[in-house]
Swiss-Prot record:
Pfam families: DUF2664. It comes from the Viruses. Belongs to the herpesviridae UL96 family. This is Protein U68. The gene is U68. It comes from Human herpesvirus 6B (strain Z29).
């Protein structure tokens, strides 16, 4: 149920309750029109409560669906991280450092020759 439907039901409930209270004051609590309006207001209160519950449920469902997809993405990323071999990363870092040291030494040697 959309927010618009929920708001419509809520406003309708408020109007019916006000009308019920107005008739109760004007005609008395036991007047047939007051009793009838009381039943109409009670029905509208139930409809409004149902609309509110449906709106909350649909909102929570949407939120939980988004969280579920987010958690799936996070779980995939975690599995990829678990697959990475830490020793391989350390070896690669050592190789990069060795290559950079060789380049540094070569540059230092070439500047000394000039």
């Amino acid at each position: 149920m959309s927010l618009k439907d929920y708001l419509r039901q809520s406003i309708s409930k408020d109007l019916e309750v006000r009308h019920r209270d107005s008739l109760k004051i004007r005609l008395g609590e036991r007047h047939p029109l007051s009793v009838h309006q009381h039943m109409i207001a009670a029905r509208q209160i139930i409809k409004s409560d149902n609309a509110e519950h449906q709106h909350v449920i649909s909102s929570l469902s949407g939120f939980l669906d988004k969280q579920k997809s987010f958690l799936k993405v996070q779980q995939r990323a975690l599995k990829q991280l678990e697959k990475l071999d830490v020793d391989e990363i350390i070896d690669t870092a050592a190789e990069v450092k060795a290559v950079s040291n060789n380049i540094k030494e070569t540059l230092m040697a070439s500047t000394e020759l000039e």
